[in-house]
From Swiss-Prot:
Cellular component GO terms, alphabetical: plasma membrane
Protein name: Probable ECA polymerase
Keyword ATP-binding: no
Biological process according to GO: enterobacterial common antigen biosynthetic process
């Protein structure tokens, strides 16, 4: 990359960042927090945060990067995608209802507490099983890629660990005070550190817990933008330190700065991967919607499907194995736009932007229903479900649409199963006479009124 090429890219970069930041800041001033603001921040992080880091790696350390024209294509496609997404998100599909909806379900205190206990048991129970099978992998494995090897059993159980976070979200939303806020941080980060040590370097639970703590603080007005920026810097440094421990790196001086740049870029902003994918566009055999279906394979026990493929060919694995011919053991993230390109080429980019706009619009609708709900127990469940889906939104921006669909369906199934089981247990306890009638009566006083939307 020459200085002239850098100047051209920087102009496009500046226009794109100002465009997205302006729209995001306007939305932030209007509502403080919604899923459009969240997705926009994650989108900026994924596709634009890495550009300065890439430039420092090129000019400070002489690192070879994807040819500039493909980086330009990546930047232009990301900007066009966001524009189409934003128009779709802001388009009103139907007029507001003048008549209230009939509530689909309601909640009481016992059912709500049973729900979060069941969610926590799912997480703690699967962590315990994984630990009994593998021990503390952080101290047993000599490389992070071995987490995905046959030496590690019960890998599918890792999908359940995350449900500790929505469980603690229910606890927070039942109280919604500063003490509950800090309890959420302490409990979820402690659990995240435990899973980091047991799994051998997976940082997702820690990142999500800290991020949700900040988002809640913004919604409640307990955190300012300056505090958020400082927390972001702290989070980046913390993730870098955890990455060093995960990969067993011991660096200092210029090497430490170089390692910080490329690990931070690869962790938070794998935007160069999109340029690399576009560079190899002619090698892609478009997969259609098959990667979405294949990503569900990991949820099917081998006992039910003995011939189940051990390796799932989703867009990330297809990009890594078939396009790049990389078999190092780690999948290279294609990003949201890259996953669309793998599935259907550049024509899937605007179609994907429309789909993502509708997805984020639905999450915001559900979140607003939770905030407007008069039954505080049902409100806690709805808001916990929405905030609990933040991890899936991160997966959407960073990993791709196929990974998002499988994870959000899995999240809905497990969350819904715990909710239904909680209601069943309440019915059994009530039938057995274990529920005090006074508690039921007081709960009925807080049942939703005719203005409820769910």
């Amino acid at each position: 990359m020459t200085l002239g090429q850098f100047g051209g890219l920087f102009c496009i970069y500046l226009i794109a960042v100002i465009f997205i930041l302006t729209l995001t800041y306007q939305e932030f001033r209007r509502v403080k927090f919604n899923f459009n603001v969240l997705f926009s921040m994650l989108y900026l992080l994924t596709f634009y945060f890495g550009f300065p880091l890439t430039c420092m790696l090129v000019f400070q350390f002489g690192v070879a990067v994807v040819p500039v024209e493909y980086l330009l294509y990546a930047m232009l496609s990301a900007t066009a995608f966001y524009g189409i997404y934003y128009v779709t998100y802001k388009t009103r599909l139907r007029q507001p209802r003048s008549q209230p909806r009939t509530p689909i379900f309601t909640m009481n205190r016992v059912e709500t507490n049973l729900t979060w206990v069941l969610l926590a048991l799912v997480a703690v129970g699967t962590v315990g099983i994984f630990f009994m099978q593998n021990g503390f992998l952080l101290f047993k494995l000599d490389s992070y890629s071995k987490i995905f090897s046959s030496d590690v059993s019960g890998v599918a159980l890792k999908r359940f660990f995350y449900f500790f976070i929505p469980a603690m979200l229910v606890v927070y939303f039942l109280k919604q005070d500063m003490r509950a806020w800090f309890f959420f941080l302490a409990s979820t980060v402690a659990f995240g550190i435990l899973t980091y040590v047991i799994v051998g370097g997976t940082r997702a639970n820690i990142i999500i817990a800290f991020s949700l703590f900040l988002f809640i603080g913004i919604v409640r007005g307990w955190i300012t933008l300056w505090m958020l920026a400082a927390a972001g810097v702290f989070g980046i440094v913390g993730m870098f330190w955890l990455a060093l421990k995960r990969y067993g790196l011991d660096v200092n001086g210029a090497e430490a700065f170089y390692t910080f740049l490329y690990l931070t870029r690869d962790t938070f902003s794998p935007w160069e991967n999109l340029g690399l994918l576009l560079q190899n566009y002619d090698k892609i055999d478009f997969q259609g919607l098959a990667p979405i279906v294949r990503d569900f394979y990991v949820f099917i026990p081998s006992a039910l499907w003995p011939e189940r493929p051990d390796l799932v060919l989703n867009t990330a694995n297809y990009f890594t194995w078939d396009v790049l011919d990389n078999h190092s053991g780690l999948a290279i993230s294609p990003t949201l736009i890259g996953s669309l390109v793998v599935m259907g080429g550049v024509l899937f980019i605007p179609l994907g932007a429309i789909v993502v706009g509708l997805i984020i619009k639905w999450f915001d609708w559900l979140y607003e229903q939770g905030k407007a709900e008069s039954n505080r127990y049902k409100a806690a469940i709805l808001q916990s479900f929405c905030f609990g889906a933040v991890f899936n939104i991160i997966v959407l921006a960073r990993e791709g649409l196929d990974s998002f669909v499988s994870r959000v369906v899995f999240f809905c199934v497990i969350f819904g199963a715990c909710l239904v089981l909680a209601k069943l247990l309440y019915w059994l306890f009530d039938t057995a006479g274990l529920i005090k009638r006074q508690g039921i009566k007081s709960n009925r006083l807080s049942m939703p009124n005719a203005g409820n939307q769910l």
